[in-house]
């Protein structure tokens, strides 16, 4: 793997000032192009389609993994917040646990995992 950073839930890359940062492999389980209720275009276009619960990478592949998973429980499927941030399933505890396991697995020794603050709403 030639990239040092893995973002496993990149979504619309809102985390980044440079949304084309060459150091980052942007992954998400979905692709989306839509117009939000306020008229702005919103695009989810990962470099690679991948599910954070089952990452297609070798052990110890990345120096930094960014894990900013969906955090919404009670929101409609087509709601503005669901489109932008994703939506948890009823099995969210097990799914996030599996995601953590996968993030740790693909991290190099003495590397860093960045977890964006989870606030379940």
What positions do the PLM features span?
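Class I S-adenosyl-L-methionine-dependent methyltransferase catalytic core
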Residues: 1-121
């Amino acid at each position: 793997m030639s990239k040092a950073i893995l973002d496993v839930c990149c979504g619309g890359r809102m985390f980044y000032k440079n949304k084309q940062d060459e150091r980052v492999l942007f992954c998400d389980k979905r692709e989306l192009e839509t117009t939000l209720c306020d008229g702005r275009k919103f695009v989810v276009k990962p470099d690679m389609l991948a599910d954070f619960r089952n990452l297609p990478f070798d052990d110890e592949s990345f120096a930094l993994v960014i894990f900013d998973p969906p955090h919404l429980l009670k929101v409609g499927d087509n709601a503005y917040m669901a489109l932008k941030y994703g939506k948890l399933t009823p099995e969210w505890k097990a799914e996030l646990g599996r995601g953590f396991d996968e993030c740790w697995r693909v991290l190099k020794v003495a590397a860093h995992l960045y977890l964006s603050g989870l606030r379940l709403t």
